[in-house]
Amino acid sequence: MTDRLSQLIQAVEEADSSKLLLEAVQNLAAARLEGAIPILIEALSYNNPGAAVASVDGLILLGSAAVPPLLELLDMHNYTARAWAIRALAGIGDPRGLVTLLGVATADFAMSVRRAAVKGLGTMKWHWFPDELREIAQEEALDALLFVAQQDEEWVVRYASVVGLQSLAIAIAEAHPTWLAEIQTQFNLMSCNDEVLAIRGRVCVAQQKLQQKIQQLKSDSFHKSIEIKETEEKKSPLTSNDWQDILNQLYEIKRQERINSGSEGDPRRFQQLAAAITETNN
């Protein structure tokens, strides 16, 4: 542990007022030191919302290194800390948080947590996914976001679904035009039928952004720049075991869907995916 990190942690531990605690956590978060992750996660449990917000911001800055301990925190019974952890996972966009965000976005009782998860589904780091797994993951995200847009009673969560759908639409526009059309149809319905003016306005912005994306896809120069960008971005810190875990979680979702719908599905699809992922990572 460096002297600087030790001093920053000591300031958090010795803070004797809400104000000093907030300042200490903010300073620790701003340092962007991986050694601070355990203390930042501990701060999510403090009875200090400002410190929790600062911790979430710091964990997001630290990115994927913070994901394993955040996922461990989800197994604990402190709902307040769990809610803040979900906000951090949503902001990081690491694929290991995907299945958690899918469940939270559609079922958590706290609207602020659902809202964070919904936005996180749209901004997932899709370029990290192996080609064999990206399609099924994006399909699950699309289903969850459409469900929220159509069913959630809280307008702030539906508003977030527009943001999430916009981000997802931009990510899948070229590879999945059918899905893009589904999103555009949902936007058209919301722009006409949603009773909240703010949502209709945000839908209008999303439609404009999508139109710009569609125009860009028609540009040869844009295609070349995207190819370069994807080559640079596709490096992922996840291991083959991480991807296998994600695949297993998605398979379980599909299995439950088959049980509920009475459909047999095709488990061979997942067997082929598992084989492809193993081969890709060897």
From Swiss-Prot:
Subunit note: CpcE and CpcF associate to form a lyase.
Role played: Required for the chromophorylation of the CpcA gene product.
One GO cellular component term: phycobilisome
Keywords attached to this entry: Antenna complex, Lyase, Phycobilisome
Entry's family note: Belongs to the CpcE/RpcE/PecE family.
Any Pfam family: HEAT_2
Keyword S-adenosyl-L-methionine: no
EC top class named in words: lyase
Gene Ontology MF: a single term: oxidoreductase activity
Protein name, UniProt field: Phycocyanobilin lyase subunit beta
The EC number(s) this enzyme carries: 4.-.-.-
Gene for this chain: cpcF1
